[in-house]
Amino acid sequence: MIIYLHGFDSTSPGNHEKVLQLQFIDDDVRFINYSTLHPKHDMQHLLKEVSKVIDQANDPNPLICGVGLGAYWSERIGFLCGIKQVMFNPNLHPEKTMAGRIDRPEEYEDIATKCVRQFRTKNQERCLVILSKEDEIHDNSKTAAELDKHYQIIWDETQAHKFKKISHHLQAMKAFKNA
């Protein structure tokens, strides 16, 4: 089973396209929607929903993935639920990048302070990161510098921030999921 979390643009038709692409490596792809506007509520909702679908699935190696803000949540929720994660162009600091877009971006900072200390060290090797060199939203060299001591990073040469085509990375995802 693969759980897919959308980014900030939850209504993008690209979300459906990504789910269809993910079905090439796993028939059971679950799309979990969340508000993007209320971080504390989103975290509670995502923890509950992800735990529920993990319990329902008959998969010894479930995987959670997302793009941008969805990648942020994939890493945290995946860690808390004990499943592997794949992040595409993660928004690592939504407390800064979401300022002006949502009412309470400081809630992300509060979430970070309440998260397990050094969770990336404890999550070592449980997350695969795919970064685009053409990300127009984030400087992924900074993202790589923050994550490369914990996770394997794959660079993509062509995709923009929303990562429309994940198909080039499906085999790496499948190998990571089943390893």
UniProtKB/Swiss-Prot annotation:
InterPro entries: AB_hydrolase_fold (IPR029058), UPF0227 (IPR022987), UPF0227/Esterase_YqiA (IPR008886)
Superkingdom of the source species: Bacteria
Matching Gene3D superfamilies: alpha/beta hydrolase
Listed Pfam families: UPF0227
Family: Belongs to the UPF0227 family.
UniProt-recorded name of the protein: UPF0227 protein VIBHAR_01524
